Amino acid sequence: MKILRKNHPLLKIVNHSFIDLPTPSNISSWWNFGSLLGVCLMIQILTGLFLAMHYTSDTTTAFSSVAHICRDVNYGWLIRYLHANGASMFFICLFIHVGRGIYYGSYVLSETWNVGIILFLTTMATAFVGYVLPWGQMSFWGATVITNLLSAIPYIGSTLVEWIWGGFSVDKATLTRFFAFHFILPFIITAFALVHLLFLHETGSNNPSGLNSDSDKIPFHPYYTIKDLLGIFLLLLVLMILALFFPDVLGDPDNFTPANPLNTPAHIKPEWYFLFAYAILRSIPNKLGGVLALILSILILAAFPLLNTSKQHGLIFRPVTQTIYWTFIANLLVLTWIGGQPVEYPFTMIGQIASITYFTIIIILMPVSNTIENNIIKL
């Protein structure tokens, strides 16, 4: 078996990626989230496939087909809630994964980091089009508001919006194409995830100390496969608790009402994992400015390798930047809270302050703290 896995053309790839992969001996549980994201992706593709067998992407029957899945299909309610809450688990793991990358300086592996940003954007796009499919009130109005933002693009904006809608409003054509996008995008994510792994295995993993670990590597299996299995069991435990005990806690009550173009909900808001970006969008009174800020809130992650001037790798021995990092995390939580609040005083002002702080920390405070710490080392 040992010879086979090392010589067989297919098994050799698996062997180099998951069995004999040289891995730093000191990576912590924060490194588990990459494998958890892979598990989340598999859960989403499997549950999504079974949902797609019963779902109809037609405005007259979409809402009813989801109700039919929950009521008449064997374990349809479980598949639906695993899929809906699986998306939340996916984004929790994604945010922690990115947060760990920032904290431990994984962005210096620039190819892996940039493919990760593409993965992040593709996952957000998949989640957005998927949220539209149940055709509830918030699904419909969320789709209308977010797609309508493209009209802020000069010259081609209005034409682009109508082209995406497939008409003059969000209707049957929009739902059909969103279903098509939602079906194909996870497979594109899978392809990008393999590229992400390919680049990662070219350079090797980072580690908590930020030091070179070439002299202290251990095989991935059995040490980290066992460690990953523990993480997977914990992930499944939390997912099952969510799906079985609190299935609708992260959803929106407006989505229990079928989509009605003549009745606008009091507060239009996306799913919780988009609220930080939505708060940044709303904090700028100008439409085009808001759209640019929204895009930059994600794309600014690509600036981390460029703005990094530190002589040290990661934040483990850098108390000044650590303080700024945790302020950044707290600020993100504030933005998430603000995104779910109505557009009125004092929430608008808090949102504007938090949005300015978000960009200030990344563009100004982190590079400045890097320079300060570099000078402290010289003393």
Curated annotation (Swiss-Prot):
Keyword list, A-Z: Electron transport, Heme, Iron, Membrane, Metal-binding, Mitochondrion, Mitochondrion inner membrane, Respiratory chain, Transmembrane, Transmembrane helix, Transport, Ubiquinone
UniProt-annotated binding residues for heme b b566: H97, H196
Recorded coiled-coil stretches: none
Textual note on the cofactor: Binds 2 heme b groups non-covalently.
Recorded GO MF terms: metal ion binding; ubiquinol-cytochrome-c reductase activity
Membrane topology label: Multi-pass membrane protein
Biological role stated in the UniProt entry: Component of the ubiquinol-cytochrome c reductase complex (complex III or cytochrome b-c1 complex) that is part of the mitochondrial respiratory chain. The b-c1 complex mediates electron transfer from ubiquinol to cytochrome c. Contributes to the generation of a proton gradient across the mitochondrial membrane that is then used for ATP synthesis.
Subunit structure: The cytochrome bc1 complex contains 11 subunits: 3 respiratory subunits (MT-CYB, CYC1 and UQCRFS1), 2 core proteins (UQCRC1 and UQCRC2) and 6 low-molecular weight proteins (UQCRH/QCR6, UQCRB/QCR7, UQCRQ/QCR8, UQCR10/QCR9, UQCR11/QCR10 and a cleavage product of UQCRFS1). This cytochrome bc1 complex then forms a dimer.
Further comment: Heme 1 (or BL or b562) is low-potential and absorbs at about 562 nm, and heme 2 (or BH or b566) is high-potential and absorbs at about 566 nm.
This protein's name: Cytochrome b
Organism: Akodon torques
